From Swiss-Prot:
HAMAP family: ATP_synth_beta_bact. F-type ATPases have 2 components, CF(1) - the catalytic core - and CF(0) - the membrane proton channel. CF(1) has five subunits: alpha(3), beta(3), gamma(1), delta(1), epsilon(1). CF(0) has four main subunits: a(1), b(1), b'(1) and c(9-12). One of its GO terms (cellular component) is mitochondrion. Belongs to the ATPase alpha/beta chains family. It is a peripheral membrane protein. One of its GO terms (biological process) is proton motive force-driven mitochondrial ATP synthesis. Produces ATP from ADP in the presence of a proton gradient across the membrane. The catalytic sites are hosted primarily by the beta subunits. Its EC number is 7.1.2.2. ATP binds at residues 172-179. It comes from the Eukaryota. The gene is atpB. PANTHER family: ATP SYNTHASE, ATP SYNTHASE SUBUNIT BETA, MITOCHONDRIAL. This is ATP synthase subunit beta, chloroplastic.
Length: 498
């Protein structure tokens, strides 16, 4: 067992003999601290500054050692605002890295980077903590077998399947359904896999974090009546926090996820929103520490920092962490070092399309732009691969014909092309699906569709057996049997109207 949780409280580990130093310089969120000779703290140790400011307000600031400067001085980055700190203030070396609470008691709660609850629901009911800095699992512990992580969402499972223990990039602008898709995945992993989820809000808006929390309570992902039945733990480090907190909040969320994988032996979903903000915070810290900037002003340690986070997200023989990471692409430049470094680690991409959302097709996952390294015949099987390729070819041909249809109309197409368009429109609608977490908004019961059912449904559409059914019958249904039943109901309704 790789993980060695301790049983102290959250935040920082306490030592019987406290090693003390004093602040000698403060520049923004960066502190220089002098320690007695031979008492220097290690890199990544947590330091705590306690005292009072000039107006008598209590100060409690936690910092993390980043550099050893020589002359018995260290340079540390603060995890909260440094307002009120003064030179000469006493600093305590905790002798260990930041430690955060882990285990079932974290579910349904919101934490900051230090593992302190910020939801006004009282202390966390656990004394088990884990340090946020840890090496990735050894190769011998990894589960190297390639297997599909079934989500129950048709468009994902068929066209861009997720790898168990893989990393998925989620691309999409505002208002196209990222949050609802994330909540549905959290719900489905809990019901179908007996797993849990951890959401790491890295450097995003406080309002979005609050909206997500409220929507999770409304949809039942977080159970207010019985918090222990919740399916997700939330860790937030918003835009307004110092760069140190934004740089480490992803590790806090990952540490909580690792406990569920290594100790509880569960499948875990780890959401990081947004992975670009992790890089951005690292860039700010790097500049504050005086490192020479690299390409486009990013930190010279960009690949190392990204690798140390991403390599801990993996499948072991005990369980798996499957990570879905929202990726912001600055100025839509895919060659920017931040997204380019992220892409090197991704196994699949899920691209959300505003065009599909405008048509009312949810989830608005773009079937042609979304990709997966798992979509290979030797991994998913010939039947799945062939069906997915034929679906993509049909949709691609429909896309090519749309300009002709817009100018000349459907009647000018050949018989074969008209058939392709009709099937493509059915496929497009069949890729939509009612979600469990959207039941409260739509009134339609949610559907979990197994991979076998998904493949069978699309094969029937492609074979032409369902050409006589109206395309409306395929909209917002689960499996193909529901579509045929809906077609019969529509037929009965139309006859009654006549």
């Amino acid at each position: 067992m790789r993980i060695n949780p301790t049983t102290s409280g959250p935040g920082v580990s306490a030592l019987e003999e406290k090693n003390q130093g004093r602040i000698v310089q403060i520049i923004g969120p960066v502190l220089d601290v002098a320690f007695p000779p031979g008492k220097m703290p290690n890199i990544y140790n947590a330091l705590v500054v306690k005292g009072q400011d000039t107006v008598g307000q209590q100060i409690n600031v936690t910092c993390e050692v980043q550099q050893l400067l020589g002359n018995n001085r260290v340079r540390a980055v603060a995890m909260s605002a440094t307002d009120g700190l003064m030179r000469g203030m006493e600093v305590i070396d905790t002798g260990a890295p930041l430690s955060v609470p882990v285990g079932g008691a974290t579910l349904g709660r919101i934490f900051n980077v230090l593992g302190e609850p910020v939801d006004n629901l009282g202390p966390v009911d656990t004394r088990t903590t884990s340090p946020i800095h840890r090496s990735a699992p050894a190769f011998i512990q990894l589960d190297t077998k390639l297997s599909i992580f079934e989500t129950g969402i048709k468009v994902v499972d068929l066209l861009a399947p997720y790898r168990r223990g893989g990393k998925i990039g989620l691309f999409g602008g505002a208002g196209v359904g990222k949050t609802v898709l994330i909540m549905e995945l959290i719900n489905n992993i809990a019901k179908a896999h007996g797993g849990v989820s951890v959401f790491g809000g890295v450097g995003e808006r406080t309002r979005e974090g609050n909206d997500l929390y409220m929507e999770m309570k409304e949809s039942g992902v977080i159970n207010e009546q019985n918090i222990a039945e919740s399916k997700v733990a939330l860790v937030y480090g918003q835009m307004n926090e110092p760069p140190g907190a934004r740089m480490r909040v992803g590790l806090t969320a990952l540490t909580m996820a690792e406990y569920f994988r290594d100790v509880n032996e569960q499948d875990v979903l780890l959401f990081i929103d947004n992975i670009f903000r992790f890089v951005q915070a690292g860039s700010e810290v790097s500049a504050l520490l005086g490192r020479m900037p690299s390409a486009v002003g990013y930190q010279p340690t960009l690949s190392t920092e990204m690798g140390s986070l991403q390599e801990r997200i993996t499948s072991t023989k005990e369980g798996s962490i499957t990570s879905i990471q929202a990726v912001y692409v600055p100025a839509d430049d895919l060659t920017d070092p931040a997204p380019a470094t992220t892409f090197a680690h991704l196994d699949a991409t899920t691209v959300l399309s505003r065009g599909l959302a405008a048509k009312g097709i949810y989830p608005a996952v773009d079937p042609l732009d979304s990709t997966s390294t798992m979509l290979q015949p030797r991994i998913v099987g010939e039947e799945h691969y062939e069906t997915a390729q034929r679906v993509k070819q049909t949709l691609q041909r429909y896309k090519e014909l749309q300009d002709i249809i817009a100018i000349l109309g459907l009647d000018e197409l050949s018989e074969d092309d008209r058939l392709t368009v009709a099937r493509a429109r059915k496929i497009e609608r069949f890729l939509s699906q009612p979600f469990f977490v959207a039941e409260v908004f739509t009134g339609s019961p949610g559907k979990y569709v197994g991979l076998t059912e998904t493949i069978r449904g699309f094969q029937l559409i492609l074979s032409g057996e369902l050409d006589s059914l109206p395309e409306q019958a395929f909209y917002l249904v689960g499996n193909i049997d529901e579509a045929t039943a809906k077609a019969m109901n529509l037929d009965v309704e139309s006859k009654l109207k006549k």
